[in-house]
Amino acid sequence: MTTSIGTDTSVAVFGYGIEGRSAVSWLRRLGCRQARLISSERPADLERNIAWIAADDLDGALSGVELLIKSPGIKPSHPLILAAMAAGIPTTSATALFVERADTAGLAVIGVTGSKGKSTTATLIAKTLEAASIPTVLVGNIGRCALDVVEDVVSHRPVIVVELSSYQTHDLTIGPSVAVITRLFPEHLDWHGGIEPYYASKLKIAATQCEGDVTIWNATDPELARRAPFGPARHVPYGLGPAAFSDTHMKLRGPHNRLNARAALCAASIFGALPSHLEGVLAAFPGLPHRIEDLGIFCGLRWINDSIATAPEAAVAALDAFGGEVKTYIGGGTDRGFDFAPLARALVSRDLPNVILLPPGGPSLLAALVALDPKAGARARVVSDLAEAVALAARLAPRGSTVLFSPASPSYGVFKNFEERGDMFRMLVQGL
């Protein structure tokens, strides 16, 4: 059922980030006269016909509100969200509203989620469909904001590819016609309140589908295999048996990216794309920034920027992608209580001469290394910041080898996000 919003519906938008701005703009285009913004400060660019209320004014913020649209980063446990629930005010998100409207219009929506791999997979799907001359639009975290294009897609009816974070799948009430789930491992536990709530939010992409829909899932992922089926749709596993395409000229590196390519073909082929279309994309697409991104040769060393790796499992995948080329590893960041044992095993098995660790989480990875192999722990060094890590790697790494920056942790309090962290790493490397 589509959420009804009329010109006189009292709608509050909570948060003024990228999606919040998009929601405010969309409400204005709808002609909604009762829209208000709830945020910590009044934005300087807020239109005068949009009322503003401080987020800490719980009573005033929700007074008379019939629908609350929240930004994806706002936790379900936020006092204002809890107050809205207690008052019986429906809460949704810009992405959920977009998927609802696409469904009502009978549009094909491919939703892509997963603890890692969703951005690359969504991009591969969109590029493969485009290679097959199938009208396509990519929206979400790596494309345009979904509500920014809702009128265009209803009018022109392309296949819609939307990348969905766990924050966005959490609010879905209607699932996409095709759901793609890449991997499942612990992430964002502070936001979701634990592993199982996080997994449940991720899998909501399938739980909200209908019987006529399709769920494409990675059969090599143990957490997904343990939980399948995830909803009423037809389930299509990928990853087992031979691939239906050639990866001979594939620019993306690593077994995980070959799995992403399999997922992309499964989804794109539903709409008529062929293996040859994917093969052409794989031969030309080098990958997205901050995802095992090759920065080139500096000081006789190849530098790889994998700032997207905010969990140990992602760093292990990056190590697997480069095999014996990596002789120096840089990792660490915010300590979220992750189990670093799998990453420590991956580092010890490669017998790397240089492991450089960043605070505050670096010591936790160091402890995991020491527990496995005291000699490996003795070779690891904890530095003060990223600049020191890059300088030390440039001095210690064997010439002709590869330096991998794959933090296995977020960087709260130091960088705004993984993009800013990756940009800083790139700048430091290019300044050597």
Task: Name these PLM-found stretches.
Residues 27, 68, 112, 141, ...:
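Residue-level signal for inorganic ion chemistry
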Residues 172-175, 205-212, 228-231, 321-323, ...:
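Short, conserved loop/helix-junction motifs that constitute active-site signature segments
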